[in-house]
Each structure stands twice: as C-alpha cells, then as structure tokens.
Amino acid sequence: MNLNLTLLGQAISFAIFVWFCMKYVWPPVIAALEERSKKIADGLEAANRASRDLELAQEQASQILRESKENAAEIIEQANKRANQMVDEAKEQVIADGKRLREAAQAEIEQDVMRAKEALRAQVSVLAFAGAEKILGATIDEKAHSEIVEQLAKEL
C-alpha cells in the first residue's frame, strides 16, 4: 500500500470523525458547558442578591431595633411623667384633705367654745341672780328670772 493512499484515507477518516463530532458530539458538550456556565453565573448572581438582601435585612433590623429603643424610651419617659403626676396629685389631695380636716376641727373647736361660753353665761346669770336674791333678800319669780337671764345672755 501506498503511504499517500493511507494518509489520504486517514485524512478522510479524520475529516469524517471531525464532522461526526461537530455534528453529534460537540453540540451537547457545548450545551452542557453553556448550561454549567449559566448555572455558575446564576449561582453567583443569587449569591450577590442574597448578600444584598442580607445587608438590607440587617439595615432594616437595626432600624427596627433603633425605633423599638426609641419607643421604649418614650414609653418609659411617659410612665415616669405619669408616676410623677400621680405623686403630685396624691400630695395635693393629702394637702387638701389635711386642710379640710384642719378647718373642720377648727370649726368644731369654735362650736365647742361657743357652747362653753353659752353654758358659762347661763351659769354666771344664775349665780348673779342668786347673789342678787341674797343681797336683796327677796325672791324673783321664774318668769322675770328667765327674762332677765335672756336679756343678760344677749348683752354678753
């Protein structure tokens, strides 16, 4: 056999093999490589997206935490103000009650003093009439006695 014919046969066989590979083998391999490349790109994009989402979620979480702290501080401040207000109201109520009790006690004392003065006036007038009877040596009748006592009580 001739070397040229063998070489030509091998070249034709190689060309058929290349054509067969390009027609039937290469497209699935290229498709698999492209699919793999696309999956890798999608994975990288998903990782980037997840990273951005994580950063966004962390920012939102920190913002919510900050707002919660502000709300808690505001609620505590309002509670403290309300507690102080309640204490002030209680103090005012106690002061008002004390003043009212003091005034009531003062009024009761004044009434007791007035009653004591009235009783003292009555006793003084009785003693005065008794002394006057002894001095005069005569008895004054009850009607005249009560009129004089009332008149003296009014004058005193």
From Swiss-Prot:
One of its GO terms (molecular function) is proton-transporting ATPase activity, rotational mechanism. SUPFAM superfamilies: F1F0 ATP synthase subunit B, membrane domain. It is a single-pass membrane protein. F(1)F(0) ATP synthase produces ATP from ADP in the presence of a proton or sodium gradient. F-type ATPases consist of two structural domains, F(1) containing the extramembraneous catalytic core and F(0) containing the membrane proton channel, linked together by a central stalk and a peripheral stalk. During catalysis, ATP synthesis in the catalytic domain of F(1) is coupled via a rotary mechanism of the central stalk subunits to proton translocation. F-type ATPases have 2 components, F(1) - the catalytic core - and F(0) - the membrane proton channel. F(1) has five subunits: alpha(3), beta(3), gamma(1), delta(1), epsilon(1). F(0) has three main subunits: a(1), b(2) and c(10-14). The alpha and beta chains form an alternating ring which encloses part of the gamma chain. F(1) is attached to F(0) by a central stalk formed by the gamma and epsilon chains, while a peripheral stalk is formed by the delta and b chains. Belongs to the ATPase B chain family. This is ATP synthase subunit b 2. It comes from Marinomonas sp. (strain MWYL1). The gene is atpF2.
